[in-house]
Amino acid sequence: MTDSKYFTTTKKGEIFELKAELNSDKKEKKKEAVKKVIASMTVGKDVSALFPDVVNCMQTDNLELKKLVYLYLMNYAKSQPDMAIMAVNTFVKDCEDPNPLIRALAVRTMGCIRVDKITEYLCEPLRKCLKDEDPYVRKTAAVCVAKLHDINAQLVEDQGFLDTLKDLISDSNPMVVANRVAALSEIAESHPSSNLLDLKAQSINKLLTALNECTEWAQIFILDCLGNYMPKDDREAQSICERVTPRLSHANSAVVLSAVKVLMKFMEMLSKDLDYYATLLKKLAPPLVTLLSAEPEPQYVPLRNINLIVQKRPEILKHEMKVFFVKYNDPIYVKLEKLDIMIRLASQANIAQVLAELKEYATEVDVDFVRKAVRAIGRCAIKVEQSAERCVSTLLDLIQTKVNYVVQEAIVVIKDIFRKYPNKYESVIATLCENLDSLDEPEARAAMIWIVGEYAERIDNADELLESFLDGFHDESTQVQLQLLTAIVKLFLKKPTETQELVQQVLSLATQDSDNPDLRDRGYIYWRLLSTDPVAAKEVVLAEKPLISEETDLIEPTLLDELICYIGTLASVYHKPPNAFVEGGRGVVHKSLPPRTASSESTESPEAAPAGAPASDQPDVIPAQGDLLGDLLNLDLGPPVSGPPLAASSVQMGAVDLLGGGLDSLMGDEPEGIGDSNFGAPPASVAAAAPARLGAPVSSGLSDLFDLTSGVGTLSGSYVAPKAVWLPAMKAKGLEISGTFTRQVGSISMDLQLTNKALQVMTDFAIQFNRNSFGLAPAAPLQVHAPLSPNQTVEISLPLNTVGSVMKMEPLNNLQVAVKNNIDVFYFSTLYPLHVLFVEDGKMDRQMFLATWKDIPNENEAQFQIRDCPLNTEAASSKLQSSNIFTVAKRTVEGQDMLYQSLKLTNGIWVLAELRIQPGNPSFTLSLKCRAPEVSQHDIQAYETILKN
């Protein structure tokens, strides 16, 4: 009979009977009793009263019985810690049993019993098991170290288990090596600063050897570990890729994705001119396609990962479009993901095929899917210019179907096509106007109103069409009301004599009859513009619109690089970095792809420009989503856009609505979402000019870098500027805020001094930052633990992170801040020193330095004289290193000391420097090279500040 009989009993009050059976002299009866206890425990009955009786059954040679008792112990030890001590002697004895299965079982169970009192007894048995002659015991003990570290990290370090664990890299058994990697990875994840996975070339060879011989899950641990390694050059990267490539044909999809992750990372270091690079691209496609033959649920994970891969390297799957065509029985989440990938892969070569598919999808019965398909046609028109006419024709065919939701979605996307290709397809406006009465969705109505307002001079009855919307003005959504207001103002500016009454009517409705502050504010702005300077109003309202982006939802490049490093994990499914959804200390390590070598630099993937900055001199681009129309005071009404960030407003605060997206969180009872909200400051398209070159670049003589000796400085802490008054009391109703920025041990802080110069007590403090160039945001709420009495001063260190919303500011290091207390909300702006963003891993390899310096165009080089600096070479190098500006190499030429230095910003931008120091001369010559020239001027200021203080 099977063991299912133990779960079918309906007896009550059997604890006493079980107790008697557990103390029976007959082994079989004991085993039966323990099975009954485990069955009761499994279905939720409390059998903890039997703890001492079950523990007595541990003294047995029967492996099955011992496993059952250990299972019981793991479940009840936490609730009965004092009783669990009874089992320690048996554990210690079992760890020396001749049977390796029992030794491993004992050490595994001891690791699973999370009771502090037992951990100290675990140390000696664990030490022996780590050096056991049997590999099964060693591999079990390796995992036990990670479990023990989770319970008591200090004990593990004091007992030297981490060193023993590291030594297992040389173990002859691949499973032991794999478990060693898994354990160290687990520990390193919870302690990012421990540097446990300090991999070297020799260790990598051992891991690659073990990779071929261990189980599939062990292979995943090893591949993930390989992904954390940084090869010293492209040759080593290619060697690793060659040995990892066979994993692509593995039957386990997790192994395949882990292998893809490693290859995607190391491809960054390979030259595109290599034959091997092209071969690797071809090898990556088939395994990814194979993953899509699974059931819908396991198919969704590869699809989400492929979405990332095609954003980074579309060439991998450019010939596999048909694989992503939707099947009739695909669930909606698979359909939508495939649709998104199809658009990303759309090109002039396959657009006809894609459009035919999308048109077919638009006739299906699933409303959500049909909407997405129609929107996809519009995205194709914007992405592939040659297909725009065909896309518009397809959309008109769909409008002729008169299916309401199809018509409405088509009008929304045609609005975007008009933005992308002005004065090209306006002939279809008449057809759109025929469907005006059938529009009942806010987005479609707003789109139609925008079209009528934008092309009012071409529509004879534009005033009648817009007037028809005014009848139910107060019943419309905010989106439609705002759009109608702007459209009628546009109409008035184009036909002033005929529409004066209409514009007065809408301004009156917006400013006098509306409770919506956004609508009211926009109405007043238009009213003042029109009444004071109609010419200026025309220039503002009818200004030429910026281009909309070809890709509205591409992930920001630095985030994409980070997500590529998390392929095969939950982060790649969420499309969010781990720190965005993992609480506590785990998952906070920021990963990024290695910097591309000079030979591998891609024209279509330039090295990260500063957050929010265009890579070249292109017109400002804004996303085509929601109601983003380029008009004055455009507000965030839809979901956040993940396209290119908007240009920032200037430092002058003026009437900026700083908290246009975050006021709710600041004014509520609790300051939730601190540092997260999207601010709604109106963008002004201000392009940052590259700093002027101050002289011809000095010949750097970098070809001899390989023979140079590194300059080594002493870490003495980053320079901290003295506190300055950021918000005077007279501007903040008695609240004075002074502060400075610091960076210590990899953490950025805003050190604040709050002084109450008012006559009333201040409480309920909260702080919020506007979107800024580097994503600076509070990492925790502003904690003022006691009310701030009159004339009292409090010092606070506010931790910051760089995972906030990004928007390019002018100047680049401008930070706009809102502070709220029980009196009011106050705004100020300050400039943070760029050196607080210099990260600790900013020392570039010499070969990489040489290749990158040569690869960065000469026009990106900025040169500057630092005067009145009395430091010698060693002191200067040491001082700069304390602020994370690292000396890669040093040489002396014609009596001049030349320091070659590198630094890296938090968003992954590298800056290379050549500092020339003439002994006895207080003037230094600094040459900087960076792929983002606008960063250089601020780096020069950082150099000068650090060296002179």
Swiss-Prot record:
UniProt xrefs under SMART domains: Alpha_adaptinC2 (SM00809), B2-adapt-app_C (SM01020)
Low complexity bias (residue ranges): 594-616
PTMs per UniProt: The N-terminus is blocked.
Molecular-function GO term, any one: protein serine/threonine kinase binding
Chain positions with N6-acetyllysine modification: K318
Principal location listed in the UniProt entry: Golgi
Entry's Gene Ontology BP terms: clathrin coat assembly; determination of left/right symmetry; heart development; intracellular protein transport; kidney development; vesicle-mediated transport
Disordered, as annotated region: 592-623
One family name in Pfam for this protein: B2-adapt-app_C
Oligomer and partners: Adaptor protein complex 1 (AP-1) is a heterotetramer composed of two large adaptins (gamma-type subunit AP1G1 and beta-type subunit AP1B1), a medium adaptin (mu-type subunit AP1M1 or AP1M2) and a small adaptin (sigma-type subunit AP1S1 or AP1S2 or AP1S3).
Protein name: AP-1 complex subunit beta-1
Gene label: Ap1b1
